[in-house]
């Protein structure tokens, strides 16, 4: 597996290809399109199997001390192979280079029983993220948001 920073003009098309292949996580068209638009302006690291992208992560600066893991997505057939963890390590290093001391991530709260997001939360916890707060209405009552944080 090869990991590389993604040039500006390649970010949105790469994001679209991965997210459209993950409808269990990114099946709400409006949300998916918002992510695709947002990544164009964010730092992105991708994982490649040969020339084919199989996952990516994006970083959004928040405050001088905090950055957000804006998005991380790996094709489902490549789950549980350490790709997400490697993408996260590279995003963490980039956040530290930018002066961040903490990394945050938002995900679906446990009050929504979606099994895919239960696995996502377990991944974040294994990577050292801790739950901070639930925002029950940020994404709508059916999609409560959990904010998690990790010290870098």
Q: Where do the model's predicted regions map?
A:
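Short, hinge-like loop/turn segments at secondary-structure boundaries
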Residues: 121-123, 151
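Short glycine/proline-centered loop/turn elements that form peptide/ligand docking sites
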Residues: 117-120, 134-144
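Conserved GNAT acetyl-CoA-binding A-motif
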Residues: 95-116
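Acetyl-CoA-dependent GNAT
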Residues: 3-71, 75-76, 88-90, 94, ...
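Short hydrophobic/aromatic beta-strand or adjacent loop that forms the aromatic wall/cage
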Residues: 42, 143-147
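A short, internal acetyl-CoA/4′-phosphopantetheine-binding micro-motif in the GNAT/acyltransferase core
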Residues: 72-80, 109-111
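Conserved active-site tyrosine of GNAT-family acetyltransferases
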Residues: 124, 129
């Amino acid at each position: 597996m090869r990991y590389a920073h993604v040039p500006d003009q390649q970010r949105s098309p790469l994001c679209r290809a991965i997210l459209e292949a993950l409808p269990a996580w990114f099946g709400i068209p409006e949300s998916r399109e918002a992510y695709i638009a947002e990544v164009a302006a964010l730092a992105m690291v991708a994982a490649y199997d040969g020339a084919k992208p199989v996952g990516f992560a994006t970083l959004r600066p928040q405050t001088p001390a905090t950055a957000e893991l804006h998005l991380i997505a790996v094709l489902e057939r490549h789950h549980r192979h350490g790709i997400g963890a490697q993408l996260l390590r590279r995003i963490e290093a980039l956040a530290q280079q930018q002066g961040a001391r903490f990394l945050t991530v938002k995900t679906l709260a446990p009050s929504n029983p979606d099994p895919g997001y239960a696995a996502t939360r377990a991944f974040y916890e294994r990577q050292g993220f801790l739950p901070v707060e639930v925002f029950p209405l940020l994404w709508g009552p059916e999609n409560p948001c959990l904010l998690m944080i990790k010290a870098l």
